[in-house]
Amino acid sequence: MADSIKVICDTLGGPIRVAMGTPLSDVAARLTPGRYPFLAAFVNNRIKELNYKIYTPVTVRFVDITDFAGIRVYQRTSWFILQKAARTLFPGHTLHIRHSMGQSGFYCELEGLDEFTHEQAAALEGHMLSLIHI
């Protein structure tokens, strides 16, 4: 393989060779699927998204939702989707993600709204799902 680089994949348990510029998603596709999909990977101990391309020899460890880093990736992604949906449905209002409510989620406020109804919550959830095409 011309211009190939060595990737030490902790998830695989050994090294593999890939072409320069290979995205992490392609490396992940070589792995036996686990119970949960991979959300990101540590590349030389730094968290990277799956479209990150590899150009030098690296050590990779993929993470899923069972890993603390995977939970954080999932949370941040959910926050971006929530922000996008809130801006679309409630223009002129600012969504604030205030603090953690333990394993129940996060406390949020929409600035400028005195009341947030069940119908508005359902519309927000529906728009979030449409953004990710579910």
Residue ranges and their predicted role:
Residues 116-120:
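Glycine- and Gly-Pro-enriched alpha-helical subdomains that act as flexible
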Residues 111:
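Conserved, charged catalytic cores of large soluble enzymes
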Residues 24, 114-115:
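Short, surface-exposed beta-strand-loop junctions and turns on beta-sheet-rich folds
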Residues 1-79, 84, 88-105, 123-127:
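Ubiquitin-like/PB1-type beta-grasp interaction modules and other compact soluble beta-rich domains
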Residues 132-134:
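Conserved small/polar residues in nucleotide/adenosyl-binding loops
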